[in-house]
Amino acid sequence: RQMCIRDRGLLPSEVSTVYLPIRRKTTFLKVREFNQRCQDWKQKYQPKVFFGMDRISSASHVRLGNGSHRAYLSRMIEASLYSPIRKFLNPLHRSILRIEREMFENPYLEKAIANSYMVKGEIVRDYSIDPSKITVIHNGVEWKELAPEFENWVETKNKIAQSLRLDPHIYQFLFIGNGYSRKGLLPLLEGLSLLKERNYHLSVLGKEKNMTPFKMRVKALGLDSHVTFFGAQTNPLPFYKMADSLLVPSVYDPFANVTIEALAMGLFVVSSKYNGGKEVLTEETGKMIDNLFDPDSICHALQLALERPKTWISSELIRNSVKKFDFSLQLQKVIDVCLQ
């Protein structure tokens, strides 16, 4: 029998749903309460498979879509985006770290599914867990469903560019991410400013609470005419069609979904080494930034991307490189792991 434990939201009618209402108001207390309620439910009903999509200390199987919180905090501190003192004083971080440790070191944990080898390595490094318990299954993409959108990018590019007031005849970079600091936009702008070739444009998509420092940096670097902030977009497909390459300069990303989405739409991808999605790139489909905090290193990767504008032939090659990651295939792998 399929069961799903949730504190909110809707699921298909064929899935039986157990709601565990959360009464606490404070975020860190909500995290603790939900974890405890899951433990209580498991102890009462003793399911054969207790699958967690997030951190719950009593899971028999868990998919680590958010990666390792400990590794995330370490990267943010290393990048000077977070204070070590806040890490230890913030009760939410302490709560998540405690649950994370209990989850990985739980003797009843049968399998953990990481979405990148990067994440698996971080967990093995930081926790007492048998590496054989961790299976890597990269994120999937709706490869088949995206086919109609991909196939008309050539004929629709000019119209899309016109609607966005962009020039379809120059090289188009694309950045998509929520929280520009963690997604590495500032170092990206530094590298972008070093390009000798100025026949390019960068479209920035995603949510950001404080846009001011990013817009100020664009102006200070003399990139006003080369960068446009489009904010959050419910449908990024027009931007994928219009762009030549996607830039993923993440400070920490277990596996940025935009990496494989862009590949499925035929875009060359430039990624930092802190994005687990880099593992699906090849020499023909992408380039890794050697040092995210060295502007010259970023500039070098961007220059290589500029030399590979999107064509019908190149886009087909790039798209076909991720056919094996079709969502249905990756989902079946997850199911198979749980039923072993």
Summary of predicted features, one role per range:
Residues 1-5:
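Short, small-residue-biased leader/transition segments that mark boundaries at the very start
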Residues 118, 140:
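Carbohydrate-associated surface elements
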Residues 171-194, 209-212:
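A conserved mid-protein helix/loop that constitutes part of the nucleotide-sugar donor-binding site
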Residues 232, 251:
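Aromatic "clamp/platform" in nucleotide-sugar-dependent glycosyltransferases that forms part
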Residues 256-259, 277:
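Short glycine/serine-rich donor-binding loops of glycosyltransferases
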Residues 268-271:
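Short hydrophobic beta-strand element within catalytic cores of glycosyltransferases
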Residues 310-339:
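A charged, aromatic-enriched C-terminal amphipathic alpha-helix characteristic of glycosyltransferases
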